[in-house]
A protein has these predicted regions:
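Short beta-strand-alpha-helix junction that forms the catalytic/metal-binding core
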Residues: 99-106, 130-142
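N-terminal secretory signal peptides and thylakoid transit peptides that target proteins
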Residues: 1-14
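Polybasic, low-complexity binding patches
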Residues: 121-122, 128-137, 149-182
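N-terminal pre-ligand scaffold of iron-sulfur
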Residues: 23-127, 171-231
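Short Cys/His-centered divalent metal-binding micro-motifs
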Residues: 114, 141-152
Length: 231
C-alpha cells in the first residue's frame, strides 16, 4: 500500500477498537514488525525491478510462514470487499508499486494448509489455464484445487477454500522504490499451520515461530523449491 493508505488503515483499525459493533463486523489489520524486502544478496529489493508473472517467496511474519510476492504485470483492482471464514468483513486496498501491480499473500492454502516447502509445492501462481484450472492468472492449490484471484485480494474463484488467502500488507516508498512488510489483513491461518506441522517444523530447526525482524529475503520459487506440482 502507499504510505498514506497505510496510515488510513491504521487509523481505521484504531477507531474500530473503540467501537465494539465494528469489531464484531470487520476483521482489522494485524500489525507485525516492519521487515524490508531484500534480495538474496541482502540488497534492498526494488519494486520496479520485480519480474512480472513470476512466483517469489519470502517468510513473514514468522520464520516458517511463507508468502507469495507477485508482480501481476498490470494494476490490481483498486479495492475488494472480502470476508473471512467466520464472516468478518474487510476491505483489501489493491496493489502497490509504480504500477500498483505488486501484491503479497500468505502462501498457506486456506483449505488444507498446503504450502511451499523446499522439497515440493502444491500451490503457486499460474498465468495459464489447464484441464483442472479454468481460470488464468490465479494462485492455484493442486491439493484440492482451490483457486484465488491475486488481483482481487485473493478472492476464492473455485474449490473448497472457505476464505481468501490472508493478504500481506506492504508499505511502498516511491522515493527509494523499496517494499516493507508491515502486517496482514484477512483470515490468518498461522495457529492452525503451527499446530498441523509442529513436528515437521521442529525437525527443521525449531525456530518456526520466531518473528521476522528487520528484513525478509525474497527468492524465486523455482530456486526455493525442488518440485512444483502442476495441475
Amino acid at each position: 500500500m502507499q504510505r498514506r493508505e497505510f496510515i488510513k488503515i491504521c487509523a481505521a483499525s484504531a477507531a474500530a477498537a473503540g467501537a465494539p459493533d465494528l469489531v464484531a463486523q470487520d476483521a482489522a489489520p494485524a500489525m507485525y514488525g516492519r521487515a524490508r524486502l531484500v534480495a538474496g544478496n541482502g540488497a534492498p529489493l526494488k519494486a520496479s525491478a520485480l519480474a512480472a508473472n513470476r512466483n517469489f517467496i519470502f517468510h513473514y511474519p514468522y520464520a516458517a510462514t511463507p508468502c507469495f510476492l507477485l508482480n501481476l504485470g498490470r494494476p490490481a483492482k483498486p479495492s475488494a470487499r472480502l470476508s473471512t471464514a467466520d464472516k468478518r468483513g474487510y476491505e483489501w486496498k489493491g496493489g502497490v508499486g509504480p504500477q500498483r501491480s505488486i501484491v503479497a499473500y500468505s502462501a498457506i492454502c486456506a483449505h488444507q494448509l498446503a504450502y511451499p516447502t523446499k522439497d515440493i509445492s502444491f500451490i503457486s501462481y499460474r498465468t495459464e489455464k489447464s484441464a483442472r484450472n479454468k481460470h488464468s492468472n490465479v494462485i492455484h492449490c493442486c491439493a484440492e484445487h482451490s483457486q484465488y484471484d491475486p488481483a482481487e485480494g485473493a478472492r476464492v474463484l473455485a474449490g473448497p477454500a472457505p476464505q481468501p488467502l490472508a493478504a500481506i500488507l506492504l508499505d511502498y516508498d516511491p522515493r527509494s522504490d523499496e517494499l516493507t512488510a508491515v502486517g496482514t489483513l484477512g483470515g490468518e491461518m498461522f495457529n492452525q499451520f503451527f499446530a498441523k506441522y509442529e513436528m515437521k517444523l521442529a525437525l527443521e530447526g525449531g525456530k518456526s515461530r520466531a518473528p521476522v525482524e528487520a528484513t525478509c529475503a525474497v527468492v524465486e520459487l523455482e530456486n526455493y523449491c525442488r518440485q512444483q506440482v502442476k495441475c
